[in-house]
Amino acid sequence: MPSPLLSPLGLGAHSLANRFVLSPMTTNSSTAQGHITQEDLAYSRRRAQSAPLQITGAAYIHAQGQLFEFGPSLAEDACVPGLAKLAQAMQQDGAKALIQLTHAGRFAEPYLRRQGYVYGPSPMTLNSPIPHQVKALDQSQIKSIIGYYADATRRAIQAGFAGIELSSAQRLLPQSFLSTFSNQRTDAYGADSLENRARLILEIWEA
């Protein structure tokens, strides 16, 4: 019996030849400003035939949420030309390319080194990589972050990606709102119900 892994799959408007996916892997090979380099392109070209669906490593939507020092950026329009080359490299052999959107929240180490603090759902004191404070986002800041996700998605589509993946695991900002450990809020994004804890993610998708 043929393996289901080898069966075609419909994904929205896209048809995939099989069900293999090249998962997001961070290479830390972009510039310090998050622009795509020749190394990024070479990496993607070498893997263009590996799976019909391919996902980039963490692309940050705003400097406040940058996860890796040399990760790709979707934070400004100036990044689009380089990202267009990346999308083309990933899709040169017929694959569909997604770009992973990331806000690192309390794990935004590059922002921490520049500012001395990071943001999350609620105030916290952390000791890694250095002792530091997590500041609580107010609702106006949350609305701004939702806008950053929407702008980043627009740039991704403009660059030629087939879609986006919203990174919502690994204690990054969206997951931090889902967790009652990191989310101690009492407002509409608060910890008292799953509906409230999931509100940020749902509003990002609606944006």
What residue spans do the PLM features occupy?
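Alpha-helix-loop-beta-strand connector modules within alpha/beta enzyme cores
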Residues: G71-L98, F181-A207
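Non-globular sequence segments
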Residues: K96, T102-F161
